[in-house]
Amino acid sequence: MSSDLPPSDPVNPLRLPFDSMGPSIDFEVTLRYSDMDLFGHVNNAKYFSFLEEARIAWFEACVPEKWDFEKHGVLVVRNEMDYIQPVKPNDRLIIRVGASGMGNTSINVKYEGFVMKGGREDNTELAFRGATTLVSWDTEAGKVCRVHEPWRKTISGG
């Protein structure tokens, strides 16, 4: 019995679409020996620092103006992480980041981390999924506020 299907061709997951509501970026993490633990892989707590680096790079890439922290702040109110497989010292780590939703005062950010085992692009697999909830912060008033309008437009893709 023959099949009309083409032979299977492994797809690099970095080439698959990322379901975000607006712009997304791929951010490569520079792994350091201090990120590793005694088991020879990235320590679970380090991933949240990686998410922060990727989120800042994404924010800088997609907001239309230089971010003035003194006027428009954001606070992290929730971080989540699903670990799928370890990242080791000779691997490359790429984090895809974008918005998954937005409320009046909050921005939901999602991440997919891809490990290139041994640094090889042809050996790329999903390593983790993460999410962060941010709230917009009025630094002068010291309280939560509506997401800054220019951010709202670009982050939502509008």
Question: What residues fall within each predicted segment?
Answer:
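HotDog/MaoC-like acyl-thioester-processing domains
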Residues: S2-F27, Y83-R92, S100-G158
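Small beta-barrel nucleic-acid-binding modules, principally OB-folds
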Residues: K71-P86
